[in-house]
Amino acid sequence: FNYDGNKYYLHEDGHMEDNALNVNGTMYLFKSWGGMCVNDVGSYNGNYYYVGADGAVSTTTGWKKIKTSTQTIWYWATADGGKLLTNSWLDYNGNSYYLKADGKMAFNEWLDNTYYFRSWGAAYKNAWAKVNNVWYYFDGNGKKYTSGWLTYKGNKYYLKSDGTMLANEWLDGKYYFKSWGGMYKNEWGKSGDTWYWFNADGTKRTQKGWFLYDKNYYYLDKDGKMLTGWVYHDGNYYYMKSWGGMAHDEWILHDKNWYYFKSWGGMYHDQWLTLNGS
């Protein structure tokens, strides 16, 4: 009988069914308070089953969907009388899914802090995933990569022991990683307010002195920092511009004073300068 929007079943002795009922080979499930399961999941003998709009337990194999006011929940019904798959992996159409203890498909969540599932349920494999603003890489088996260096599409990355990708961070004081994770190599990189040169193998250049790049001379200290402003080297004063390049063949205004620098960068001082005939 129907009451307050729910269906109930009363036996001949008057007691209300609150478990399961087999009618001509069709199984119906009831909640503990007596209402019949409709468009829902019910349990019987320690197993979960999907129940359709007619209240009958579905015996067809495949995905089953239940929509709530906030989300869509997916289940997988097995060929074993429609029992829902629980605590198990499912390989389907080239993707791997995980059905939890209650039969619900995992999505947007971790499993054993090792696997992570997309919004539509498939485990990430051979792919990057951003979780809570942190990037992780998952190998071909879907496991979070925690083995250090990773080469991916021509770039080198570093994954820490917890699997998080280094970004805007140093490794061993020698390597530095971009905001998107790639390691700097054969290029300038900025950490904080300081520029560094990174060699082809990614290590920071720490050879103190001059460095020629793209027809400009730069000066690096022993820690690899690119210097700006005044530099004193081998008895001569040089001036490094705000972007690092050495001034030469030009005037520089510094602290309200003008200075002129030779073709090789040294500052003129204590001598006459003839320039443009003057």
What are these regions (language model features)?
Residues 1-278:
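Extracellular adhesion/carbohydrate-binding repeat motifs centered on closely spaced tryptophans
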